[in-house]
Amino acid sequence: MGISKPLPLFSILVLYFSLYTITPTSSLASLQDQFINCVQRNTHVYFPLEKTFFAPTKNVSMFSQVLESTAQNLRFLKKSMPKPGFIFSPIHESHVQASIICSKKLRMHLRVRSGGHDYEGLSYVSQIDKPFILMDLSKMRQVNINIQDNSAWVQSGATVGELYYRIAEKSKVHGFPAGLCSSLGIGGHITGGAYGSMMRKYGLGADNVLDAKIVDANGKLLDRAAMGEDTFWAIRGGAGGSFGIILAWKIKLVPVPKTVTVFTVTKTLQQDVGNKIISKWQRVADKLVEELFIRVLFNVAGTGGNKTVTTSYNALFLGGKGTLMNVMKKSFPELGLTFKDCIEMSWLESIAYISGFPTHTPTNVLLQGKSPFPKVSFKAKSDFVKTPIPESGLQGIFKKLLKEDIPLMIWNPYGGMMAKIPESQIPFPHRKGVLFKVQYVTSWLDSDKRPSRHINWIRDLYSYMTPYVSSNPREAYVNYRDLDLGRNTKDVKTCIKQAQVWGANYFKNNFNRLMMIKAKVDPENFFRHEQSIPPMM
């Protein structure tokens, strides 16, 4: 594609001479009008205001509806949380370019949202820059599949569920190895790595990106050739909101069989005597055939004295159940899997199943962009385990889980292709040596009067896990944002010092390279948030 046509020289001159004409005392309503006028002057493609621009001063109910539409964590929709001054939903690439020019001109901070799954709400809440504009990419969701060359272009506003559905429309033997949650926005999802149930066979979504279209801090539209290999490296796992606005990804499609097999086998503590099943899983999950992905979900069931921890072994096998049973009998007989437990289906049907929809749910549910679970307030954290957790450690985990109202812990197996890809291939470094990734989640309803107790609980569990997880650094998954690890301030020098800590957690030795690339492509730190990559100074 190369570099798109540059914006008119007049627009650049307007930007230059007007940088100092907007005063901090300008009213928000005035800024809204100026932003609209500026975008209209800097794009050749018309946009209907009633469908693309939403402000509390214009229509409060519509503004709230759009703001809440894809915000996944209700914790960040509370009245006490900062709200954008207004929301702009572009429908064309040039609108994104113009928005960058105009937000710079008006000295307004910009946040960008594709699917709204940021665990700390950073794609739609700013606590360090106010006022701010929310650019919502949900109207840019085209998916173009090319089966002949095993590729697809997908715009950032599309969900992974939409992408999977459109692939299956064209072919029953092609897929893409990205997220387990079908409502994830593909734009931000891939920037953090994008793991899914085929990661052991094909790696991450970010490992299977061929090209991208981004708009940089100068409002230029770039593809891989134009942005250069450093920037292309950075955006595939270096997390969103740092290097530019991702408009679209070109992805590599991977082969899948016509028939796959899924199962979910749930055990209580009483059924797993001596923790033999979970202990065996720790020893074999990363060593099983690459076609088999078995994750474990820890929940709490029952009440009062009957309360217990359950472990659900939730799996996808790229093949039929006969072959799967042979693998399980040989490698993991302790689970006691039976033919009755196994369900054969298409790869697309398995997406809905793994996402949490009931078996036999029509696959067009994936086009709705919604989770099968109700929205709640939640806090999450992550870890990586490199040696099996001993019996004593497991007992302590179970005791912690039984103390919380709605706890969830998920163990996702690594190994396979994940162990073959070098740590520096893309910014995502969690590769060889990782047995499994841990996700901790606690959630609560809005009616809960003491949300702080849930956050204290998860921090206590995280502290308890210290001896059993990676160290120096204690690794974390950037798509499970955790501001407990640290956050940026407006002072760039202070930012860099603080960022070295959480940067090592997320990116290990890749963090310095990310900061150097940031300094080259966005030295003024236009794209920033509480955990964005700061420019190296």
Curated annotation (Swiss-Prot):
What is known about its processing and modification? The FAD cofactor is bound via a bicovalent 6-S-cysteinyl, 8alpha-N1-histidyl FAD linkage.
Lineage: superkingdom:
Eukaryota
Q: Where is the signal peptide?
A: 1-27
Disulphide bonds in the chain: C38-C102
Q: Which Gene3D superfamilies match?
A: 3.30.465.10, 3.40.462.20, Uridine Diphospho-n-acetylenolpyruvylglucosamine Reductase, domain 2
- Which cofactors are required for activity? FAD
Task: Provide the residues annotated with a glycan attachment (glycosylation).
Answer: N59, N306
Q: Which Gene Ontology cellular component terms are annotated?
A: extracellular region; plasmodesma
Q: Where is this cross-link: 6-(S-cysteinyl)-8alpha-(pros-histidyl)-FAD (His-Cys)?
A: H117-C181
Q: Which family does it belong to?
A: Belongs to the oxygen-dependent FAD-linked oxidoreductase family.
The protein's name is Berberine bridge enzyme-like 26
